[in-house]
Amino acid sequence: MKVILLHALEKLGKKGQLITVKNGYARNYLIPLEKALLATSENIKIFEKKRLFEEQQEAKKIDYANSRIKAIKLIGAIIFFMKSSKKRKIFGSIGVKDISKQLISLGLLIKKNEIKLPNGLLHYLGSHTVLFTPYKNISTEFKVVILSK
């Protein structure tokens, strides 16, 4: 029996794939648990349209993420002025929240979960590298510079 997978299943295939399985497995397991759909010509057409729509949405999200990365690269570096000790340690720390507020004040729409600090909170003066990941595997690095007041 031919079915269209609605979810990725280990050892069977990926979502949207047309596969052939035994009749009992399809009728008693895959179809009742909504893991697959009977592969009629109508269902194949509907699923193909849905897949094309999802691909278009994915492409839009990727384009938007790339445009946001270009905007981050135009900025170059973000500068913070903080009080510090003689040992170059700042009073307080700079975290994701502070960086996102600074980027928002520069006119970029940034969520806190899109910014990653590889070494944790920033506690020392100097230049630090921060990772910006707007969508899945699309990311870039930018600099955060901390100077003494």
UniProtKB/Swiss-Prot annotation:
GO terms for molecular function: rRNA binding; structural constituent of ribosome. Keywords: Ribonucleoprotein, Ribosomal protein, RNA-binding, rRNA-binding. GO terms for cellular component: ribonucleoprotein complex; ribosome. Pfam families: Ribosomal_L9_C, Ribosomal_L9_N. It comes from the Bacteria. One of its GO terms (biological process) is translation. PANTHER family: 50S RIBOSOMAL PROTEIN L9. NCBIfam families: L9. HAMAP family: Ribosomal_bL9. Belongs to the bacterial ribosomal protein bL9 family. Binds to the 23S rRNA. This is Large ribosomal subunit protein bL9. It comes from Buchnera aphidicola subsp. Cinara cedri (strain Cc). The lineage of its organism: Bacteria, Pseudomonadati, Pseudomonadota, Gammaproteobacteria, Enterobacterales.
